[in-house]
A protein has these predicted regions:
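Charged, gly/pro-rich active-site loop segments
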Residues: 1, 52, 73-135
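Short, basic/aromatic recognition patches
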Residues: 1-17
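Short solvent-exposed loop/turn micro-motifs enriched in small/polar/acidic residues
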Residues: 11-13, 26-27, 83, 113-115
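Short beta-strand segments
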Residues: 13-50, 69-71
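Structured soluble/peripheral alpha/beta segments that form catalytic or ligand/cofactor-binding pockets
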Residues: 55
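Short coil-to-beta transition motif at edge beta-strands of beta-rich domains
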Residues: 64-67
Length: 135
């Protein structure tokens, strides 16, 4: 798949899986909501219940900024299956003005209760994907 197709799948997906790696090489995978803004994908630590605000994903990004995001579509009709991935470098950002704006355009919940962060900004270095329809 070309990068434009993969990037387009991120425009229709509502949730992604963020993959980070800790300093010992152990993977960590969590679902996130996100917004694409050019070549940057934004996400936020928001008010949804969490055991702590000191999240493993934030520590992992500080230790190793290389991350992957995966979106996918499943259907019982396997000719409809697809997945798309964005690989890039993430950074934790406390000033989330750009992220809040992008996320609020995509998710009505953030218009009512904007996240207070911290925020994650991922500069995408590679878009890739697969679709059963295209083999």
């Amino acid at each position: 798949m070309d990068s434009g197709w993969a990037r387009g799948r991120f425009g229709v997906a509502r949730v992604a899986r963020l993959a980070t790696v800790d300093d010992l090489g152990r993977p960590h995978l969590v679902p996130i909501v996100f917004a694409v803004d050019g070549s940057v994908i934004h996400s936020a630590v928001d008010a949804k219940p969490k055991s702590s605000r000191a999240l493993r994903r934030l520590a992992n990004i500080s230790e190793n900024p290389q991350v992957s995001l995966l979106v996918d579509y499943y259907d019982e009709d396997w000719t409809q299956l697809w997945w798309a991935r964005a690989d890039g470098r993430a950074r934790v950002d406390d000033d989330g003005r750009t992220a809040i704006s992008a996320l609020a355009r995509r998710y009505p919940q953030y218009r009512e209760a904007p996240p207070d962060g911290p925020f994650i900004a991922i500069t995408v270095e590679r878009w890739s994907g697969w679709s059963a329809a295209d083999g």
